[in-house]
Amino acid sequence: MPSFDIVSEIDMQEVRNAVENATRDLANRWDFRNVPASFELNEKNESIKVASESDFQVEQLLDILRAQLTKRGIEGAALEIPEEMDRSGKTYSVEAKLKQGIESVQAKKLVKLIKDSKLKVQAQIQGEQVRVTGKARDDLQSVMALIRGADLGQPFQFNNFRD
């Protein structure tokens, strides 16, 4: 029976490249001349710290970062940005976490979405991924289109497609 896995993975090398490109962009921007602003990638915590001297500049830095991530093939929804900014002295900062893996609550939403679609497929939660099996390849492709179209707040990839 044909099957595929739904996963949520981020290539950390691409994230590193995007942060380096964003830092390069920052050096070339005239509105950030002589302004202490930075991007810091923490691969251990899978987060990116963005810091500057005003909250407006932090928002601009986040826009630069999102643009660079998109250029490198990583969706902007992969960043989990907190509502409130940290402030210490003259510096505002935000620690944006990278979403990887499918949490159990999100996996249950995926399975419910698939079952509510009334397609002839089965969905099973397997750790941090969801396996979808069905008799017809067309049904599996319909599930892929359904998930791409649904706004679940996290980017998903499909791998391990088997006939």
From Swiss-Prot:
Keyword annotations for this protein?
Answer: Nucleotide-binding
Role of this protein = Nucleotide-binding protein.
Q: Which Pfam families match?
A: DUF520 (PF04461)
Please report the name of this protein according to its UniProt entry.
Nucleotide-binding protein YE3147
Q: Which Gene Ontology cellular-component terms appear in the entry? A: cytosol
Species in which this protein is naturally found: Yersinia enterocolitica serotype O:8 / biotype 1B (strain NCTC 13174 / 8081)
Q: Which GO terms describe its molecular function?
A: nucleotide binding
- Write out the similarity annotation: Belongs to the YajQ family.
